[in-house]
Regions:
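Conserved catalytic network of the ASCE P-loop NTPase/AAA+ motor domain
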Residues: 12-13, 58-63, 81-86, 134-137
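ATP-dependent small-molecule kinase phosphotransfer cores
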Residues: 6-67, 71-73
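Small-molecule kinase domains that catalyze NTP-dependent phosphoryl transfer to phosphate-bearing small molecules
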Residues: 109-160
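Switch/connector loops and helix/strand junctions flanking conserved nucleotide-binding motifs
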Residues: 12, 77-78, 98-104, 151-155
């Protein structure tokens, strides 16, 4: 998979270069000046401005490999524009709002310093970001229901195999 970047602080249990490359604002600005940023989103969080981005940093070799990227609809559209429609296959994983909130709360409770206000802000922002209108605008039709992890993964693997 492609490892994205973020300027947000690392959470407990995360490792640099695994979930994200964790960088500061200065490094983001340098990469922007070097024209290495493919797409980015900045959020005015309860803890300050956090930026998430994908960079053309040498880890993407489309002629040799296929990749899995986790992102927003906005990032999907930007990547599709950058790399082309023919190489992008959206895998939209849908989670019922109550379950999504419950999972987020469980993850936040596990932190030494839980950021509940930020959890609430992000939950509401995600509801807007992943609205029906935005899904339709991005051309995302196929959805995978994340109720049972194993079933969801099997369906996604079948879809990936069809598109290879």
């Amino acid at each position: 998979s492609i490892v994205p970047y973020t300027t947000r602080p690392m959470r407990e249990g995360e490792k640099d270069g695994v979930e994200y490359f964790f960088v500061d604002q200065e490094r983001f600005d340098e990469m922007m000046d070097e024209e290495k940023i493919i797409e980015f989103r900045s959020y005015n969080t309860k803890c300050g401005i956090w930026t998430y981005f994908t960079a053309d940093d040498g880890q993407i070799e489309l002629w040799q490999y296929d990749y899995l990227v986790i992102g927003t609809i906005e990032s999907y559209c930007a990547l599709k524009e950058y790399f082309g429609d023919d190489v992008m296959v959206p895998l939209y994983i849908e989670v019922e709002d109550g379950l999504r909130l419950s999972r987020a709360l469980e993850r936040e409770r596990a932190q030494t310093k839980p950021q509940y206000a930020e959890l609430c802000r992000r939950f509401l922002a995600d509801a807007e970001d992943f609205s029906e209108e935005n899904l339709e605008r991005a051309g995302i039709k196929r959805r995978f229901q994340n109720i049972d992890k194993e079933t969801c993964m099997e369906e996604i693997l079948r879809e990936i195999n069809v598109n290879l």
